[in-house]
Every structure is written in structure tokens, then in C-alpha cells.
């Protein structure tokens, strides 16, 4: 597809990152508009698992974490029911969703942690505030750790891309590594 030249080199680079339990992902709004099929094909080629309104289970030493991914979170007509609703509240569930707004706009019950991007950290920030932000909730879901009204924690990353113009000021690119630790009982 035209405009998708970045797909192969991006996923080839991501494939070099060693992930002992696998690599999973969800699509962004621009991915749906342009390169969806090529991204899915390339992810699978490199052994990565796209989660489009699907769940997968990571198991280790008798423990499990459930990953749930949201297909195009901007199409609430078709995707307005979170895949987490069918899961047990006893499980530890991580929700992968492109836009942070989804966890406020849709019930994401049974979610213990949500991971999102989309905002690019504001892309241009002045004194920590983004004058233009592609979230209905403004700077509340700009970057870092936030919570929805149900008190579900959400980590929003700046990511590595840009939108509209290829510029970033005060909102550096980032790839975030999250380490989970079991709480002492």
C-alpha cells in the first residue's frame, strides 16, 4: 500500500527486541486508514500477535496475565464493547488500546492496567501543557500515569511517531518498559 514503506523496517527492528513471552500490539487510527492489512501481515511474519478485540493469556510458573486488545477504538458502533467485559475480575488483565479516551468512554470493567498512546505526549508541549491535543479529555490523558473515573490505572506513552507535522517540542519520543511485580499478600 502507498505510504506504508515504514512498516517492514519498523517491525524488523521491533523483532530484534527479545521478549520472552511474546510481542503483542494493537493498531492506531492511522494504521486503520492506510496500512492495516500490511501491518497485520508483517506483524505475523515476525511472530508478533495483533490483538483486534481479542485476548491472549501469558502463563509462567503457574501464574497468568491476560492481555486484551481493542480493535479501532474510534469506531464505537462496532467496538464499543470492551473485550475485558467477558473476563473474570479474578484475573489480572492488561488492556491494550490506542487512544486513552476509550477507557473513559467505554466500560472496561475487569481491567487492572490499561496501556495507550495516540496523544504523542502532546507532540508540542509548552511548560508541560499541550496547546493542541487529540483527546476529548485534554491534558488529563496527555502522557504518563493517569486514572479513569473508575480508578483504573492507565499508562500513556509518547510513542515514536508524530501526527500532522514531523516535529516534537517538549514531548520526546519514548519506548516504555513496564515491569510488573506481585504485591505482597
Annotate the PLM regions.
Residues 22-29, 51-54, 94-97, 112-120, ...:
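Active-site neighborhood of phospho(di)ester-bond hydrolases with catalytic His/Asp-centered motifs
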Residues 15, 100-179, 184:
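Conserved beta-sheet core of the metallophosphoesterase superfamily
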Residues 3-7, 95-96, 135-136:
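A conditional alpha-helix N-cap/helix-loop micro-motif detector
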Residues 1, 29-33, 56-58, 72-75, ...:
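Solvent-exposed loop/turn segments at secondary-structure junctions
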Residues 59-61, 149-150:
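Short strand-coil-strand connectors
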Residues 40-54, 60-97, 103-104, 109, ...:
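Binuclear metal-dependent hydrolase catalytic cores centered on His/Asp/Glu-rich metal-binding motifs
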Residues 8, 52, 77-82, 132-140:
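N-terminal post-signal-peptidase region of extra-cytosolic proteins
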Residues 1-49:
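Membrane-embedded segments
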Amino acid at each position: 500500500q502507498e505510504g506504508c514503506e515504514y512498516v517492514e523496517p519498523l517491525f524488523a527492528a521491533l523483532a530484534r527486541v527479545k521478549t520472552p513471552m511474546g510481542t503483542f500490539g494493537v493498531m492506531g487510527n492511522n494504521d486503520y486508514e492506510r496500512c492495516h492489512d500490511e501491518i497485520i501481515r508483517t506483524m505475523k511474519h515476525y511472530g508478533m500477535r495483533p490483538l483486534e478485540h481479542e485476548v491472549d493469556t501469558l502463563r509462567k510458573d503457574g501464574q497468568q496475565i491476560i492481555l486484551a486488545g481493542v480493535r479501532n477504538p474510534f469506531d464505537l458502533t462496532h467496538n464499543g464493547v470492551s473485550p475485558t467485559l467477558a473476563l473474570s475480575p479474578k484475573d489480572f488483565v492488561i488492556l491494550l488500546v490506542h487512544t486513552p479516551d476509550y477507557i473513559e468512554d467505554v466500560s472496561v470493567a475487569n481491567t487492572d492496567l490499561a496501556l495507550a498512546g495516540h496523544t504523542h505526549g502532546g507532540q508540542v508541549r509548552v511548560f508541560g501543557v499541550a496547546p493542541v491535543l487529540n483527546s476529548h479529555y485534554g491534558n488529563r490523558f496527555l502522557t504518563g500515569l493517569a486514572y479513569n473515573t473508575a480508578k483504573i490505572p492507565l499508562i500513556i506513552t509518547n510513542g515514536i511517531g508524530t501526527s500532522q507535522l514531523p516535529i516534537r517540542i517538549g514531548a520526546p519520543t519514548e519506548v516504555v518498559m513496564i515491569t510488573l511485580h506481585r504485591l505482597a499478600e
